[in-house]
Structures are given as structure tokens and as C-alpha cells.
Amino acid sequence: MASRVNTSFTLIPKQKCRRSNHHSSYFCNTLDSDPQLLSTLGNFKVLPLEILHIILRYLSVKDIGMLSMVSKTVSQHIINYISTSSGSRRLLLQNFHDLDLPGTKEETALLEHYRALGLLFKRCTLLLPTKERLKYIHKILSEVSCFKFSGCSVPLQCLGLSCYGMFLQTLTAGWDELECHRVYNFLCELTNLSRKMQTVVCNKPGSARKLELRVRLFCRNVLLDHWTHRSDSAFWLTRILKPWPMVNQARLLYIIFGPTSPHDGQVIWQEMIEGPTDESSLKGLANAIKLLYDTGAKGWTADDVISLVDELSVVPREWLLENNARLLILSGNNICFTFMASKAVNGRAVELARLVVFLALVCEKELYCMDWTVRMMQKVCKVFSTAAERKSFLQSIANAFACVTMEMLQPVMSGDRDDDDRGFLNLFHLLHAQANFHKEVLYLTMNAISS
């Protein structure tokens, strides 16, 4: 008696493909039309689709990615598996809120999973045009609400956008600029990002705090934070900033990298205006400025970056000069000197002299070497074309020390003191800064005489 064939599984058809099988129709037609492609499945050709899917379930994402490179047929099989409900459930992990603290093993493992998933999609869609790749990937990822711009109700406690960013970074790594432009435009169209940016940069600062936070999180977690090479980060930051006028670029830079509240994550607009701030509040802005300046990002000249720094120092209103000085120090020697030289060339010597005073004050507070401030002043002096201009600049510095001292002394003398004596302490640091500054000038003079 002929043995009965077990029909509980769907066998891969050799002659004709059923039209009702939507996920595998393309695959079946391909096999029918070219028998050679059937051999590219190797030993898998005798397996029912369900068995192959079970095997894929036991493979790691990295192993599935390696398997997808065997042949176009195998790759198409894996794409079909990803499109199934069981495949998407297994691959699109969504435990974004079950993590206790940043940097834990669980968080690292989840990010690594999406890095591997990005590589898998990169390999499976290798032969598709960029536009088709993006459409297919969006179709799969759209099932995950936390990957959407406003898809999560608790964005500060969610790792979704970071995983999405890790996925995109791995997917697009090595793509040329034109393809990356298309990716950015696709994301902007998908999320209406440009319109949302327009809302936060054109309205009064703080009037749309929740939207500011969403823009910040999307730009940082999806577009900027996961790149290994600084040039890649500079490329994406340029895409974000360059469509806007300089004043809006500064606002957007502050939203993305400026200080935020530890309680609700919202941007603190008054931080630079109300009092001296600390390094942590300025570090993100300084790093972004250095990124654009040091990498020689396409579309940015030194003058562009300096203009951006100048514009940033009045967002939302003019900063305390101490905070401006701290930003310049954190931005590095080249940016600091170029910024100061620009003021010297444009005849703003008095303003520049006050800046020197606050550079000295920050160095005193943070225990930086005061010799740095003196040498920076000496370098800027050479920008002035005549001896009379240099002498006038040095006199302006002496006058600035006296004026700033009197400004800080007045509230102390009037008894208008803070609960924490901040004003008195600031005056104390300024007097020490002045003494150490002039000590370094004397050392410099003595060394010049002895040589």
C-alpha cells in the first residue's frame, strides 16, 4: 500500500503556488520560474514552511542575519518570516519600560538586539532601492507604538526611541550622503518633524514644553546619539539645523542640547539668565558646537559656527557673561580664540575685555590654570593691528576688573545677600581671580625680560 503523506504542514509547492498564500506568493513564483533557485535552499528545500519558521525561531537574530546572506531565495524566505505575526512578535521586542536603571544589562541587551535587527534588515533588503527599503521597514516597525514620535505616554522612562535609533544607525551605516538625505526626508515626512520644529522655534520659548521635549528626544535618541564616528553625527546635526535661519538654529540647538529639569525632562530656558550655571548644563551645547567646528562638517565654515555661538548666547535673552565664558572654555581653545578674535576685529574691545574678566573668574572657580586665560589674552592682543589698540585693550581689561568688582560689591554692601551667600562667594572668587590673573601677567613679563 502506498504510504500516506502527512498533510498537516504546507509543503513548498514544486509546480503551482496557491494564490491565497499572500506572504509566500512572491517566493513561490520565483521558485517555479527558475529551478536553479530551488537548489539555493539547500537541505531546507525539503522542509515545510512551518518547520523552517520553527527553525528560525531558535536562531539568534545575528544568526538569521548571516543566514539571509546565503542566497536571494533564503533572504526572501526570511522576509516572509518577519512579516508573520509570530516572526514580528519574536523579533520586535517591546519591553522598553521594564528597565530599572540606565546602563543595566537588560538595557544593553535590548539595544544590542536592535543593532542586530538593523543588520538583519540591512542584509535582507540589500537589493531593494532606498525608497522601497524604507517603505518596507516602516511597514514592519509601524507596529511598535514606542517608535513613533509621540507614541509613548512616558517618553522619559522609555527606551523605544533609543532602540529605533540604534536600528536606523546600523541600517544606514555606510550609506552615501544622498541615501542618508532620503532617510532624513522620509523620517521628516513620516513624523511631520519640520512642522513640529517650526512650532517650537518660532513660538515663545517654553510655550510648548511637551513638544520641545518630544523634539529633543527624537533628535537625540533617533538621529544623533548612536553614531561611532563624529563625522556621521555632524552630518545628521547639519540636516537638522541647516534648513533654518541662524536665529532658529540657535533655538533648536538649545532645545536639543540645553539644560533640562531632572524632574520632568523639560528644557530650562532661564538657566543661563538667572545665575551662574555649572559645567553639566553647558556640556551638551559645547560638544555640539565642537562637533560642527572640529569635524569640518559640510556646509559649515568657522564664521558660521562662531555666528551660531554668538546667537546662542542670547537665547532666549542675553546670558550672564560668566555662562558665556564657561561655554567658550568648554568648547575648546580654537573656538574660544576665534570667537574672541572676531570681536577684536569688529571693534568690540570693551565687550571683549569684560569677557576676559569672566574667563578668569571661571578658571578660578573651576581650578583651571590661570595661565591659560593670560595666554589667550596675549594671543588675542596680536589680532589688533596697532600698538595703540593693544594698549587700549589692556587698559579696558583693567577697567573691566574694577567695574565688575564694584557691580558684585554693591549688593553685598547694601545687605542684599542671598540665603546661600552666593553673591558674596562670587565676589570672593573674583578678587582671587584678579590677583592670580595679574600674578600670571607679572610672571609673563619677568620671563620676557629675562629672555
Curated annotation (Swiss-Prot):
Q: Which UniProt keywords apply?
A: Ubl conjugation pathway
One Pfam match, given by its short name, reads: F-box
**Tagged with keyword Secreted:** no
Q: Organism's domain of life? A: Eukaryota
Can you give the residue ranges of the F-box domain? Answer: 41-91
Self-association and partners = Part of a SCF (SKP1-cullin-F-box) protein ligase complex.
> What does this gene product do?
Probably recognizes and binds to some phosphorylated proteins and promotes their ubiquitination and degradation.
Question: What is the name listed in the Swiss-Prot or TrEMBL entry for this protein?
Answer: F-box only protein 47
